[in-house]
């Protein structure tokens, strides 16, 4: 077992008001899913190094928010990198709606919002950023997301001209517009 100070602690809480939580539970049950995300016995080490973490398991239902807590170097970002398919775990598995996911599948089904958003924003305007990679006309959806994130007035602005918090809202907006079933925020 890893020393207590290197273990990853995690807590589960619902981040929505009561009525919203009920909506997400109803939506989840109506789609016949028991858990949106299941992580079982995940472990990781860099090449021949010691374990960064091991035996990490948790479940997250649709609408749940999970906070991963730990000191610097505990493996929080490494865990997110595995969950998003950027790194391959040493052991364990990640499932979405009961289906085991490969790292490649995890990359396409999740969206990672990083603390330093400058590496995630590429377009010439906020609106263009939200529509990148979309195959269909999604103007109504983009308008709704811009309104919800209080970014409507910044639609035509270059992402680099926004504050740090506004940039983070843009990256969260991208995840919402793309309907990513799982959103990770680091």
Segment roles from a protein language model:
Residues 92-106, 110:
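Conserved ABC transporter NBD signature motif
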Residues 139-154:
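Conserved ABC ATPase "signature" region
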